């Protein structure tokens, strides 16, 4: 399926492109992005390119979709996740995975998973870690602001007051 998105190829090298998404695997989920917040972390990744700790070293060959604060609709569910997720449901994502000790994260590290695309593929590890969240609210932007709000709350609790 065709999608349009903002992909990073390196330092200060962002491109709006139309490209083909592969068919999802049994352990993946296809989603339609509706809202993606803009974050200074994304700006930092765009400036640093592969020097950013979450951006793959081969980003010039295998570009990633940027945007990690996103929400939208589930379009297609791989067989592994059909009991937990349904087509048409709304979702929000928690991008801080720390999967098996890696720094990989949606919006920084994956060729087919990021918020700045019309459609993307959520990889298995996101669901394995419970980071694809069902969203019951009305406004998609509220769901895409969940991650930055959690940063604010975490910073508040980390401060002496």
PLM regions and their residue ranges:
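Extreme N-terminal starter segment of soluble prokaryotic enzymes
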Residues: 1-4
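NAD(P)H dinucleotide-binding glycine-rich loop of Rossmann-like/cofactor-binding domains
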Residues: 97-161
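Glycine-rich beta-strand-centered segment in the early N-terminal region that forms part
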Residues: 22-36, 51-100, 114, 133
């Amino acid at each position: 399926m065709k999608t349009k998105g903002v992909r990073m190829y390196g330092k200060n090298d962002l491109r709006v492109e139309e490209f083909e998404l592969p068919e999802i695997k049994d352990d993946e989920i296809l989603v339609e992005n509706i809202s993606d917040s803009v974050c200074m972390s994304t700006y930092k990744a765009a400036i640093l390119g592969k020097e950013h700790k979450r951006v793959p070293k081969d980003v010039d060959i295998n570009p990633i979709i940027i945007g990690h604060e996103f929400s939208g609709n589930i379009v297609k569910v791989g067989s592994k996740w059909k009991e937990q997720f349904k087509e048409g449901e709304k979702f929000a994502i928690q991008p801080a995975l720390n999967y098996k000790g890696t720094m990989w994260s949606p919006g920084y590290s994956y060729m087919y998973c990021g918020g700045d695309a019309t459609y993307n593929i959520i990889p298995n590890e996101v669901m394995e870690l419970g980071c694809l969240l069902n969203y019951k609210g009305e406004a998609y932007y509220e769901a895409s602001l969940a991650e930055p709000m959690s940063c604010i709350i975490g910073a508040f609790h980390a401060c002496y007051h």
